[in-house]
Amino acid sequence: MRSLFENIFPVVESLRKRKQLRCFFFMRKPPGLRLRFALHSLRGDAVREIESCIKSLVRRKVIAKWFPSVYEPETFKFGGPEAMEAVHAHFFADSKAWWRWEELRRGANTSIESRLLSLSVLNDLFAKFLDGPEEVWDVWCRVATLHGASVVSEGPAIQAIRIEDLIDRVTPGEQVILRSYLSCNGAMARRFGAIHAKGKLLFGNRLVLPHVALYHWNRFGFTPDDRASIFTAMMHAWSPNV
């Protein structure tokens, strides 16, 4: 998989700089990966460049096969058409941040583990959207129930760590990643606020945010145990009943 992304992300960045790409993100989904490209136009060399890259990966046996498909966004899961655009922008930023993190991690240039990075990012995201710790706790409870887990107040003694708690304690490379999350989290929260003010948000933030968390964890490749360790700790950390 590493070789695939080593080839894909330079193409993504090149298309973005040439203003041919609106969005890119990926999902881990059987039988492999789903790569989602949103181009400004299907004409021109952008499609050929993407296909050439992927066909080269097949020839070099980096991947077994590929096929194009129609993308049908889960619009209503994420709050409606306008909200979906904001979520896609966040997915793009999250995908790029994940790859930067992977490059640091493989080079042994990280000072924190992936789960700590993730919980700080999600705590920051939830807090930017919501009014107070009780609402953040409620979202973590919803994340737990989406995994079939029970809402509990017991858990490991850990603080509700946010990005600002880590950013001055990590390596310069990690700081770049955390700053990118501060930016994209803030951008999505502001966009949702504007959509809500226009009456165009079909479902509330606390219904949408758990699904954003699940997609983020999918990109990071977290196991069920990884996920449970995060949401269990955060239910305890944010609980108003502790």
Indicate residue ranges for each PLM-predicted region:
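An acidic, charge-biased composition feature
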Residues: 1-242
